[in-house]
Structures are given as C-alpha cells and as structure tokens.
A protein has these predicted regions:
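Long, Pro/Ser/Thr-rich low-complexity/intrinsically disordered regulatory tracts in eukaryotic proteins
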Residues: 2-213
C-alpha cells in the first residue's frame, strides 16, 4: 500500500487525476497551503479520515481563505490531511484560536473523535485520592518492567506546531529553561536540548527510557 518517509508520512502510490473545475484533488503532489485553491476532493478509496468526513462544502466555504489570530491559514491547518489522504484525523490546529476561528471544522472533528459536543463541560480534579486505580494483581504487576508518562503542554500566546516559527521555538525554549532553573524538590530536574546532546548523554537517556531512537 505504501511506506513511511523520513517525516512519518505515508508515501502512497496514487496517480494524480486530471484537473477538475471547482476542486483541488488531494494527494502528495500538494506541497504548500496555497496549492489548496478549491474544495478538496479526496480519492474515493481514501475517504476515511475525520477531515474528509467533516470538510463539507459548507464548512469549506465558511473557513477557506481565513486566518486565525496567530496568522495561521485554514489551508495550513488541513494541508497535512490533504497531502496524506490515508491520515486518521487529517488536520492540525495552528494556534489555540484555530479552534474558534475554524470552529465549523474543528467542532465536528472533536465531536467525532472525543464523542462529545460543544456543550460538554470539562471537569478538572487534581486530588489524586479520587482516582479509581486499584492495585494490579501480583501476577499482572510482575509483568511491568518500567513505565513512562509523557506530559505535553503548550505556552499561551504562542502558535502550535503548524504555525510556530523557528524564532518562536527558540523563545519558548529560553523561557522554559529559565523556569526550570527555579524548580526544587520533586519538581527539580534536568533540561536537555536535543541538538546539544553528547553521545554519552544520548546513550544514557536511551538506556533510562527517556529518549527514544
């Protein structure tokens, strides 16, 4: 069917259709957001992504050509899914504001993926004693060699992946490292910049299951 390239995207063997008035044929030949000039049309055999299901002509007309508060265009948000037509979801928010500016699309996708609508209320509880996590039976617990929990967060007022610039990435790293310097006790730790790791540090982090090959 295809294989993954160095960026993790699949390389499908599909033929670019002949031009068709009023639509942009989706596929790996799309390289830039500006290439999506008209309503995206997905190959019939690759129409299972949430983007394909949610991106009706009405949604396209409501969002096309618009930009969110960070300056990220709607076409930028959907480019990956239009390029990689076998995607599961197929879109990326360019900033926190994308969810508001492009709500006609993102609301539908979140409802399909998370199974709740825009009226649902998120309830936060930071009391660990309220967690319903009974101990595992001894035979099951014995099979666990190590566990790893990854927590990802985004800084307010910065674009997300598709919209952030190299300069902003450096700014985020600078702010985060300065904040880490003030952490003590259980929050204390070590910050590692991937582009500055020595081989010894890299090997040790891999051995400790913090860094993956």
């Amino acid at each position: 069917m295809g294989c993954a390239n160095s960026h993790g995207h699949s390389e499908l063997k599909i033929t670019k259709p002949a031009p068709e008035e009023g639509v942009t044929h989706c596929g790996p030949w799309l390289k830039h957001p500006e290439d999506i000039k008209d309503y995206p049309k997905f190959p019939a055999e690759y129409s299972k992504s949430l983007l394909c299901k949610a991106l009706t002509k009405d949604v396209w007309e409501a969002c096309k050509g618009r930009k969110d508060a960070a300056g990220v265009s709607f076409e930028t948000c959907i480019l990956s899914g239009c390029q990689n037509v076998d995607s599961g979801i197929g879109c990326y928010a360019g900033s926190h504001d994308s969810y508001t500016t492009f709500a006609p699309l993102f609301d539908k996708i979140m409802e399909m993926y998370h199974k709740h609508g825009t009226t649902a209320k998120h309830v936060s509880c930071m009391d660990a004693s309220q967690l319903n996590c009974p101990p595992l039976p001894e035979d099951e617990a014995a099979m666990i060699v190590s566990t790893r929990i990854r927590v990802g967060r985004n800084l307010a007022d910065y674009p997300l992946g598709p919209g952030i610039s190299d300069a902003q990435r450096i700014e985020v790293m600078t702010r985060v490292t300065k904040a880490f310097e003030n952490y003590t006790g259980d929050l204390a730790g070590q910050f590692y910049a991937l582009n500055k790791l020595s081989k010894k540090e890299k090997d040790q982090l891999i051995a400790d299951h913090f860094l993956f090959k």
